[in-house]
A protein has these predicted regions:
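Extended hydrophobic/aromatic segments used for targeting, binding, or gating
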Residues: 1, 9-10, 160, 165-202
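Glycine-rich phosphate-binding active-site loops on the catalytic face of alpha/beta enzymes
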Residues: 52-58, 164-180, 212-233
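Alpha-helix boundary/interfacial micro-motifs
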Residues: 61, 68-70, 84, 159, ...
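Catalytic cores of alpha/beta
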Residues: 34-37, 151-163, 190-202, 206-221
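Glycine-rich anion-binding loop/nest that anchors nucleotide
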Residues: 146-151, 168, 202, 224
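Active-site entrance/lid segments in N-terminal catalytic domains of soluble metabolic enzymes
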Residues: 1-161, 173-176
Length: 233
């Protein structure tokens, strides 16, 4: 569950009793960071994963082309889509108002003010976040803690040194930096270096069951993905 989720940690905690991991985005607003951390604690989330590969927005060409924002803006193109797909319009009018419940008490952008994801990352997240910040967040959380976005052996070893119990080998689906290395290409070396001390999760490019089998065979403890439900997994 992400800091930018459209459903709150409290609601999710009441709905399911399975293990839950929170994906933390480190904002400039330290009050917001503290609020999110405490809410995840109070909702009995099991793992905190600090995202370290998006402290600034990437050049998301698809979002630029489609004009995607949060919340969605009405444009000629989107209105045409609603006209040709009436179920979309019905859902928009009858379902709950779009909101980002973890953020809305602190920032208008994303809930009341439309903004692209790239611009949100570049203006709201803390570009000065460093290893000391990650270590403090790990200590403040006091439970299972992971860094999400690790792609090198050196960073994997440093993650272990600051107290991480897991790492997510990920390039954010290739959307942050199109020239970033593939998680699959880095996985074996990272597992060899730290796999006996922390859980290593592979994320990125997972679109079918055989991809999971390959990642597990390289030593990953698990696989993750943002759109697995779209691939009938």
């Amino acid at each position: 569950v992400s800091s930018l989720a459209t459903v709150s940690v409290e609601e999710i905690s009441n709905l399911v009793d399975t293990p839950k991991m929170f994906q933390f985005y480190y904002h400039k607003d330290k009050g917001l960071n503290n609020s999110i951390l405490q809410r995840a604690k109070d909702a009995n989330f099991d793992v905190m994963a600090l995202t370290v590969d998006t402290i600034t927005g990437g050049n998301r060409e698809r979002d630029i082309r489609t004009g995607f924002t949060s919340p969605p803006k009405f444009t000629l193109s989107s209105m045409f889509s609603y006209v040709t797909k009436p179920k979309w319009a019905i859902n928009y009018l009858t379902k709950g108002k779009f909101e980002l419940p973890h953020l809305q008490d602190y920032v208008k952008e994303g809930t009341n003010t439309a903004i692209s994801i790239g611009n949100y990352f570049s203006t709201m997240l803390d570009q000065d976040m460093n290893w000391k910040d990650a270590e403090k967040l790990c200590s403040d959380w006091g439970g299972h803690f992971a860094l999400k976005g690790i792609l090198s052996v050196e960073d994997a070893k440093r993650a272990v040194d600051i107290g991480c119990t897991g790492i997510v080998v990920s390039n954010h689906g290739g959307r942050q930096l199109d020239g970033a290395r593939s998680p699959f290409d880095q996985l074996a070396d990272i597992v060899e270096a730290v796999g006996d001390r922390v859980d290593v999760i592979c994320e990125g490019g997972i679109q079918r069951g055989t991809h999971m089998l390959k990642a597990l065979s390289l030593g990953a403890k698990a696989c993750a993905g943002g759109r697995l439900y779209l691939y009938a997994l």
